[in-house]
Amino acid sequence: MKSINILAAVVFGTLSTLSATAEQVGEVGVDWVGNDIIIDAIRDPKVEGVTCHVAYFDRSLIDRLSNGNWFEDPSNASIACRQTGPIKVGDIDLSEDGEQVFRESRSIILKSLRIKRIFDEANQTLIYIAHAQELTEGSAKMSISTVPLYNATLAD
């Protein structure tokens, strides 16, 4: 039992250090019931000098009460990633599947907003894709942004 607890602590600690954190930088009210568009800044933890801004819809309590869906926010998100300083690429996943940079729950257990980074080696470009992942069904809602690696420092 002790080894399982140690393994769980190591896995949780590793996962929590790999995922970026979001910092809210904007909030736009869209109606009288309190629904908002939230804008977060997310720095890529393995690529210094790249920041992604993600906008998503945050439902108000009144909207949740009137629609009867208490525990879920919409999956829609928009992403824009830019160079915000000298780019220094760390040890990133180079596979076609890419690497998760950020994850945030959009419901109690079934849905999350995720940002993945994929490296396009032929074009020396980082591709960031924001998408919803649902336990019960897939979602076609996605948004991408690219950051070209002009004069970037790559990990050895």
Where are these regions (language model features)?
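Residue-level signal for mature regions of secreted extracellular proteins and peptides
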Residues: 45-46, 74
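Mature extracytoplasmic domains of secretory-pathway proteins
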Residues: 51-120
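Extracellular/luminal recognition modules and glycoprotein regions
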Residues: 23-45
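C-terminal partner/receptor-binding element of secreted or periplasmic proteins
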Residues: 122-156
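Residue-level detector of short, conserved catalytic/binding motifs and their immediate flanks
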Residues: 37, 50, 79, 126
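Sec/Tat signal peptide C-region and signal peptidase I cleavage site
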Residues: 17-22
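Bacterial N-terminal signal peptides
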Residues: 8-16
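Bacterial N-terminal signal peptides that target proteins for export
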Residues: 1-8
